[in-house]
Amino acid sequence: MSCSNVTMLVSSKPSLPDASNLSFRSAFNPFQLPSQNSSSSCTPSRPTSIQCGLKDLKNRIDSVKNTQKITEAMKLVAAAKVRRAQEAVVNGRPFSETLVEVLYSINEQLQTDDIESPLTKLRPVKKVALVVCTGDRGLCGGFNNAILKKAEARIAELKELGLEYTVVSVGRKGNSYFNRRPYIPVDRFLEGGSLPTAKEAQTIADDVFSLFVSEEVDKVELLYTKFVSLVKSNPIIHTLLPLSPKGEICDINGNCVDAAEDELFRLTTKEGKLTVERDVIRSKTVDFSPILQFEQDPVQILDALLPLYLNSQILRPLQESLASELAARMSAMSSAFDNASELKTDLTRVYNRATQAKITGEILEIVAGDIECIIW
C-alpha cells in the first residue's frame, strides 16, 4: 500500500507532536484516526504547507543538509579572513588620519601665504566624480545594496543641484549594477582583488588625479562602507578632492554641494523647542612647534605628500569595505546556517510523521480486512 501525497503544516516553532497533528484516511477504508482538540497545544503563527511524497521530502532534507554544510564552510572562511582584515583597518587608521592632519596644516599655511596647489585649489563645482566601492562577491546580506542605494541617493542630490556627475566603479557587483543602467555615466570600471593593495589603490588614485587636474571634474567623492564592528557598518561619503579642511565647496551659483554626511548634526533648542542644526566639521590640525622649520618649500613638501595622501585615502576605504563585506558575509552565512538547521528539523519532523501515518494506515487496513473477513 502506498501513500502518494502527504500534507502537513509546519510552523517556525512547531509544537510537540500529538494525535491532533495526524490525519489519514485510506481510499479503501473509511477508518480515520480520532482528532483531539487540545487547548494546551500552541497555534502555529505562520504555518507553511508542505505537500510532497516521501521520496521528494527525503530529497529536500538531503538538499538542506548540503546547503547547511556550504553555509557553515563559508561562515568559517569569512570568520578567518575578517580578523586579518580588521587588523589591517585598525593598523592603517592612525597613519592615514595623521597624514591628513599634517596636510591640512601645511595647506592652511599655504593659504595664508596665498600659494595655491592643483589639488587644494577650490573652484566652482560643475561636475562631480563618485568613486563607488563595492564587493566582488555576493552572499553578504545587504552590504552591496546599502552602498549602491547611497550612491543612487547622492546622484539624485546632484541632479537636484543641477550638477553633472560621473562614476568610477570599483568592484564586480558595482560594475554589474552600473552596466545594467546605461543612463548613469561611468568613467571607468575597476575590479577589486581579494586583498586591497597599494598598487590597486594607486590605479584608482591615478584615475581620479587625472580627472581633477585636467578639470574634467571639480570634486571627487569617495563612497565606501566604513567598518565599525563585526555586526555594524555604515555607508560613508568622503570628499577626496579638493583638499579643503573647511569644506564648504560650492557650485557656480555659490550653493554648497557638500553631502549631508560631511556635516555634523547638533541637537539644540530654539524658542523652547528642540531643533536640529548642521555644523560643518572642521578637521583637527597639528600645531607645529615654532622651532620646527621645513628645509624645503612647503609647496614642494605638499606636492610630495599629495600622492601619498591619495594612495592612503583610497587604500583605507578599500580595506574598510573588505572588512565590512567579510563581517556581513559571516553574519549572513550564520543566519543561513541557523535557518537551514531549523528547516532541516521541520522537514525531518514532517517526514517522520508522514512515515508514521503511512504505517498506521497500513495497520488499519489490515485490521479492517480481518474484521471484514470475520463479519462474512
From Swiss-Prot:
Among the GO molecular function terms of this UniProt record, one is: proton-transporting ATP synthase activity, rotational mechanism
| Disulfide-bond pairs as recorded | 250-256
- A Pfam family matched in the record: ATP-synt
Main subcellular localisation? plastid
Q: Where in the cell is it found?
A: Plastid, Chloroplast thylakoid membrane
In terms of InterPro entries, this protein maps to: ATP_synth_F1_ATPase_gsu, ATP_synth_F1_gsu
> Which keywords annotate this record?
ATP synthesis, CF(1), Chloroplast, Disulfide bond, Hydrogen ion transport, Ion transport, Membrane, Plastid, Thylakoid, Transit peptide, Transport
- HAMAP family per UniProt: ATP_synth_gamma_bact
Q: Main role?
A: Produces ATP from ADP in the presence of a proton gradient across the membrane. The gamma chain is believed to be important in regulating ATPase activity and the flow of protons through the CF(0) complex.
Q: Which PANTHER family match?
A: ATP SYNTHASE GAMMA CHAIN, ATP SYNTHASE GAMMA CHAIN, CHLOROPLASTIC
Subunit and interaction comment: F-type ATPases have 2 components, CF(1) - the catalytic core - and CF(0) - the membrane proton channel. CF(1) has five subunits: alpha(3), beta(3), gamma(1), delta(1), epsilon(1). CF(0) has four main subunits: a, b, b' and c.
Q: Which family does it belong to?
A: Belongs to the ATPase gamma chain family.
What protein am I looking at? ATP synthase gamma chain, chloroplastic
Taxonomic lineage per UniProt? Eukaryota, Viridiplantae, Streptophyta, Embryophyta, Tracheophyta
